[in-house]
Regions:
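GT-A fold catalytic core of metal-dependent nucleotide-sugar glycosyltransferases
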Residues: 3-49, 57-64
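A glycosyltransferase accessory/donor-loop signature
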Residues: 65-211
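Small-molecule pocket liners
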Residues: 54-56, 114
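Short, solvent-exposed loop/turn segments at the edges of secondary structure
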Residues: 51-52, 111
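Short edge beta-strand segments in beta-sheet-rich domains
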Residues: 52-54, 94
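Detector for methionine-enriched segments
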Residues: 56-57, 86
Length: 211
């Protein structure tokens, strides 16, 4: 997550750089983002709840002089708040260009969706059925107990809170689109069957993604 702030420095502060999280998928060619970027802006990104989101950014590296070592140092010395960093509020001098949600669509596909972001970790389609390998934050024992009781007595409950395995994505279009991307990548030899078997054996992907 933090490595996104290394990109301008890594590219010697040159060119425009598209930075995306690994759980973002291109459903269409994202090159139009160049046209939607204002050359007077430091970066372009999507806003949610009036906050700029840093998981997908087009950064003008010639204008954005982030020093990764300094950022990390300030973060661990509590000089920068983590949420402020993620929401790009750590630098109030940034000139941010707001672009459409089609470039960072959270778990839904619309006609204009270009970049699909699978934000809910427990329903990421390539993990379906595997044991959860992350810690669920901000959950009390009472919350978990309450959901288990609801399940036992057969009433509606929050599966995400108590599931020990990754769940099926609730949006069939999202699930099918990502499955098709995996199959297309295999067909185009970006990886082979041996690679797939290795990642399945290491519990990095579920075999269900190729069904």
């Amino acid at each position: 997550t933090l490595l996104r702030f290394l990109a301008p420095q890594l590219n010697n502060y040159k060119d425009k750089i598209l930075i995306i999280d690994p759980d973002i998928f291109a459903l269409k060619d994202p090159k139009k983002i160049i046209e939607d970027h204002r050359n007077t802006s430091d970066l372009s990104c999507v806003f949610y709840n009036n906050n700029p989101r840093s998981e997908m950014m087009l950064v003008d590296a010639a204008r954005v002089k982030w020093n990764f070592k300094n950022i990390i140092s300030k973060l661990f010395n509590f000089e920068i708040d983590y949420e402020d960093l993620m929401n790009l509020k750590f630098n109030l001098n940034l000139n941010i260009n707001k672009i459409g949600k089609c470039y960072n669509s959270h778990d839904k596909i619309q006609d204009d969706t270009i970049l699909l972001h699978t934000t809910n970790r427990i329903t990421q389609p390539w993990k379906e059925g595997l044991e959860i390998n992350f810690f669920k934050h901000n959950l009390s024992k009472f919350q978990i107990f309450k959901e288990h009781v609801k399940k036992i007595i057969g009433i509606s409950h929050n599966k995400e809170l108590i599931s020990k395995t990754f769940l099926k994505h609730p949006n069939k279009d999202v699930e099918n689109s990502i499955k098709n991307l995996f199959k297309e990548a295999k067909r185009l030899n970006y990886f082979n069957q041996k690679d797939i078997e290795k990642e399945i054996a290491n519990f990095n992907i579920s075999k269900k993604i190729f069904e």
